[in-house]
Amino acid sequence: MDMENFIDIDSSVSFDTQDFIHFVRGRRSHRRFLEKDVPRKDLETLVDLCRYAPTGSNRQTLEIMIIQDRGKIERLSNYTVDFFENEIDSLAREAEAYREAGMEVPQIITSALTMTDTLNLIVTARKFGLEVIFHRAPVVMIFHSPVETSCPKDDCVIASTTVTLAARTINLETCYIGLFEFAANTYQPIVEELNLPEGHKVYSVLILGYPELQFYRTVDRKPMRVQYL
């Protein structure tokens, strides 16, 4: 450990609570970015900040892969669409097999089938030259961790959420890409392309860049259901 990193904590808070709430509410999911590279120093700042995000049992086992190579991003996008195209056909065949056998289609399959319209749109979009996985973002951040650790999913999501907020302080915006997270842990071509350390899985994925659009309003949310006991 570097003892110089044990810095004094200032107990005073330099920002107002309402200002912080407004800042958090101002975070929006961005899917359109300028064709502008993100400086390495800014990425390093965000990565370094993740060191201080809490982890289960203080294990600190999560790792980050940052992809800026446009060719690699395009390959991963195409692999993801391939995966879901295969999944659509596979789910339909499985459901039909259950029906032909006079059996009830399992809930896990019927639930997955509700996503087929969305997945078909993704497949169709590619045919028209659209990139709807990473949205042509200049940076893809993949948060991965050993499966055999205290709280791998929590660790990665806490770190990625920290990035979504900190990025806004340097004029960057983000969006979570859950579709890729699912495919990355299932589809062999993606597994091989990422070549994660043995025993690791992807638990959170962000795209990041300078936003092309500016939002002028926050959005409303459902009231939080809470119990005070």
Protein language model annotation of sequence segments:
Residues 1-40, 44-45, 74-79, 83-109:
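N-terminal accessory segments that position/regulate proteins before the catalytic core
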